[in-house]
Amino acid sequence: MTKTVQIGNRIIGGGNPILIQSMTNTKTENVEATAAQINQLTAAGCDIIRCAVPTMDAAKALKEIKKQVQIPVVADIHFDYRLAIAAMENGADKIRINPGNIGSAERVKAVVDIAKERNIPIRVGVNSGSLEKDLVEKYHGVTAEGLVESALDKVKLIEDMGYDNLVISIKSSDVMMCVKAHELIASQTDHPLHVGITEAGTIISGNIKSAIGLGLILHQGIGDTIRVSLTGDPLEEIKSAKLILKTLGLRQGGVEVVSCPTCGRTQINLIQLANQVENMVADIPLDIKVAVMGCVVNGPGEAKEADIGIAGGIGEGLIIKHGEVFKKVPESELLEALRYELLHWNE
């Protein structure tokens, strides 16, 4: 089991629930836009947020951003150790650094000293795209073994400076390399692990890669925080992360929507209806399964494993509860009838 690490008002590791992270895509210097996006992501289920800090103005903006948000803010630092120090001085709850790209050991120590003074966790990040040349040569290419050695070397560097309030992340866009790296490092450290497939891609490819990679890693009991990296709206990352955790049985809550793939018997616009249902239930705080079926012939039977379902017909639809037809309603009222049942579920 990994050690516990406190990040602002959240605790990770030590068997605590796996938390969902995302990253803002606003300019961090724009306080209002960044805070607004963080609050939107928080409402969707984000637990920890990371912000890019490429400038001193961005580091200073964290102080005002922190006043407007409720979840921990992680400062993402590259190259300039002074930005890491400024970010911590302005309220960052955690910093993410790659000690290999912020300069000499003295500069790393300057960052570690401030982190130690304020008890701010450091996430040590290693990425397959920036693996050290000597490790590439040693392992004849970028490999899981090289990534793990790089990460553990950087962890030891900081531990030797007298600080061990650390989180480790190993990222690769190669899904199976990423899986192997996590399997290797999990047996060699008790620091919490942040898990994600980097540069996963657009919504479709990114979701598939992340679901496979994170699924294989998390199913082995590895991982304390996750991010689904997508080229798109960060809100999509939260939706996907929640579904991955729920599918693996690692998080409860939230309505699960299942729907049939459509066939020649489909008598309604099922694709539109399923999307409408998915959007409708996003903010309903129930831990149930909802089925959306395309015909009244197979609908009741196929929806049997769901808590509630709907099936469309010609001009009318069925509301199905626990596999039994509960009521018939006009097709035009099907969505609203389902909404009513969900909002009054516990009555």
What are these model-predicted stretches?
Residues 1-23, 116, 279:
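N-terminal amphipathic alpha-helix/helix-capping segment at the start of soluble metabolic enzymes
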Residues 15-33, 52, 71-79, 135-148, ...:
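Active-site mouth loops of central-metabolism enzymes
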Residues 18-24, 49-51, 73-77, 95-97, ...:
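Hydrophobic faces of well-ordered beta-strands that scaffold small-molecule active sites
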Residues 25, 30-31, 42-65, 96-104, ...:
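Glycine-rich, proline-tolerant flexible connector loops at the mouths of alpha/beta enzymes
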Residues 56-77, 110-122, 182-193, 277-279:
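Alpha-helix-loop-beta-strand connector modules within alpha/beta enzyme cores
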Residues 69-71, 88-95, 116-119, 186-192, ...:
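Glycine-enriched alpha-helix->loop->beta-strand junction motifs that scaffold or abut catalytic
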Residues 82-123:
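Hydrophobic or amphipathic alpha-helical targeting/insertion segments
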Residues 127, 135-282:
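Catalytic alpha/beta core domains of metabolic enzymes, predominantly
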